[in-house]
């Protein structure tokens, strides 16, 4: 099988991106030139080869250390785990090109927010979010209403104006979690999922969807998690969220035939419902599995009412 790093280099070069394989902070990475060679982006391919959890966790620890060093020196890298590349290749390739400056532009001011059904959210997130849909109570969609300025002219020239009315982003939120602070009840909601079309750079989309949810539900606060495989969560800070705690890494079992990623706790629960297994069995290698431990996440909270 071709190495993941070679697959990425080949794909970027096929799309006109000048890149090279280099060493950064102990990792073999792809250094891609963007903005006509004026700057570069670091891509970190993550081969999934661990045949037990100890190896997977050790790899994750070393990866986290290297990513921290790379971030300080070159900016946060683009991290591409092998299972994502093989199982969700179309989405991953589109997102990778978007990071390289190859994208369609849309602005939230030219879009409208609508409530959508759970089924609509499920389909969109299955196609455009790394983890797909998760249980949510409130589902919102952002629909393209019009193009303006140079974007409109570009769409007309490329005969792409027919995507007006298209669903281009989705945000979902949980039901309320309630607790009492002093003499008042606080209602907190989780921002569960957000995704936009991977080939489109959407300016202001997250903010517009969040404002619609706040206007409808009037929460006391909204919390969410930034997936550290994608970013450090700067977009949440720009929306007024405050960083809180780190979310621990999650262990996954990977089926190399399908590259499906299954959390170890789910795998163990499914097994133990059929047969009684000793606790340590959940960490024993299956002969047909690889293991991967992700980078965890960072928790963010937006407080909309004054409480301690």
Language-model regions: role of each:
Residues 1-22:
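Acidic-basic catalytic patches of nuclease active cores, encompassing PD-(D/E)XK
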Residues 18-33:
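A short, well-structured beta->alpha microelement
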Residues 31-37, 143-145, 302-304:
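Active-site beta-strand termini and strand-to-loop segments that position acidic
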Residues 34-61, 176-177:
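Short beta-strand-loop-alpha-helix junction that forms the active-site gateway
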Residues 55-87:
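Catalytic cores of nucleic-acid endonucleases
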Residues 72-75, 218-222:
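Short, high-confidence coil segments that cap the C-terminus of an alpha-helix
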Residues 83, 91, 95, 100-220, ...:
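A conserved beta-strand-loop-helix scaffold within acyl/acetyltransferase catalytic domains
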Residues 225-287, 293-307:
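Active-site/acyl-donor-binding loops of N-acyltransferases
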